[in-house]
Amino acid sequence: MTYVVTDNCIACKYTDCVEVCPVDCFYEGENTLVIHPDECIDCGVCEPECPADAIRPDTEPGMEDWVEFNRTYASQWPVITIKKDPMPDHKKYDGETGKREKYFSPNPGTGD
């Protein structure tokens, strides 16, 4: 099992989760984070840290797409281990559905 970052992180990008990860498996895009599913050790410490409830176990129904999404972008984006401020309008987007289709950017973030 692994954990994956899902839709609600997009356009919010809280980074509370990255500082608690013992294996540094979070990667930063321009407006979201992802977890490298092959590096995640399934410890679960990141899940309760996410204010947007965007981190889910891959065993939940419908997570297959998110596993591949996370794997794809983790191989392209820089690692992030230090907490940063969320996106400027994060409160506006938190909880909105369909954010991947509306707002996702494939551009990398800056990393640490």
Curated annotation (Swiss-Prot):
<dbReference type="InterPro" id="IPR000813">
    <property type="entry name" value="7Fe_ferredoxin"/>
</dbReference>
<feature type="binding site">
    <location>
        <position position="9"/>
    </location>
    <ligand>
        <name>[3Fe-4S] cluster</name>
    </ligand>
</feature>
<dbReference type="InterPro" id="IPR050294">
    <property type="entry name" value="RnfB_subfamily"/>
</dbReference>
<keyword id="KW-0003">3Fe-4S</keyword>
<keyword id="KW-0004">4Fe-4S</keyword>
<keyword id="KW-0411">Iron-sulfur</keyword>
<dbReference type="InterPro" id="IPR054829">
    <property type="entry name" value="FdxA"/>
</dbReference>
<dbReference type="GO" id="GO:0051539">
    <property type="term" value="F:4 iron, 4 sulfur cluster binding"/>
</dbReference>
<feature type="binding site">
    <location>
        <position position="21"/>
    </location>
    <ligand>
        <name>[4Fe-4S] cluster</name>
    </ligand>
</feature>
<feature type="domain" description="4Fe-4S ferredoxin-type 2">
    <location>
        <begin position="31"/>
        <end position="60"/>
    </location>
</feature>
<dbReference type="InterPro" id="IPR022569">
    <property type="entry name" value="Fd_C"/>
</dbReference>
<feature type="binding site">
    <location>
        <position position="17"/>
    </location>
    <ligand>
        <name>[3Fe-4S] cluster</name>
    </ligand>
</feature>
<protein>
    <recommendedName>
        <fullName>Ferredoxin-2</fullName>
    </recommendedName>
</protein>
<dbReference type="Pfam" id="PF00037">
    <property type="entry name" value="Fer4"/>
</dbReference>
<keyword id="KW-0677">Repeat</keyword>
<dbReference type="InterPro" id="IPR017896">
    <property type="entry name" value="4Fe4S_Fe-S-bd"/>
</dbReference>
<keyword id="KW-0479">Metal-binding</keyword>
<keyword id="KW-0249">Electron transport</keyword>
<feature type="binding site">
    <location>
        <position position="43"/>
    </location>
    <ligand>
        <name>[4Fe-4S] cluster</name>
    </ligand>
</feature>
<feature type="compositionally biased region" description="Basic and acidic residues">
    <location>
        <begin position="85"/>
        <end position="103"/>
    </location>
</feature>
<keyword id="KW-0813">Transport</keyword>
<feature type="binding site">
    <location>
        <position position="46"/>
    </location>
    <ligand>
        <name>[4Fe-4S] cluster</name>
    </ligand>
</feature>
<comment type="function">
    <text>Ferredoxins are iron-sulfur proteins that transfer electrons in a wide variety of metabolic reactions.</text>
</comment>
<feature type="region of interest" description="Disordered">
    <location>
        <begin position="85"/>
        <end position="112"/>
    </location>
</feature>
<dbReference type="GO" id="GO:0051538">
    <property type="term" value="F:3 iron, 4 sulfur cluster binding"/>
</dbReference>
<feature type="domain" description="4Fe-4S ferredoxin-type 1">
    <location>
        <begin position="2"/>
        <end position="30"/>
    </location>
</feature>
<feature type="binding site">
    <location>
        <position position="50"/>
    </location>
    <ligand>
        <name>[3Fe-4S] cluster</name>
    </ligand>
</feature>
<feature type="binding site">
    <location>
        <position position="40"/>
    </location>
    <ligand>
        <name>[4Fe-4S] cluster</name>
    </ligand>
</feature>
<dbReference type="Pfam" id="PF11953">
    <property type="entry name" value="DUF3470"/>
</dbReference>
<keyword id="KW-0408">Iron</keyword>
<dbReference type="GO" id="GO:0046872">
    <property type="term" value="F:metal ion binding"/>
</dbReference>
<dbReference type="InterPro" id="IPR017900">
    <property type="entry name" value="4Fe4S_Fe_S_CS"/>
</dbReference>
<dbReference type="GO" id="GO:0009055">
    <property type="term" value="F:electron transfer activity"/>
</dbReference>
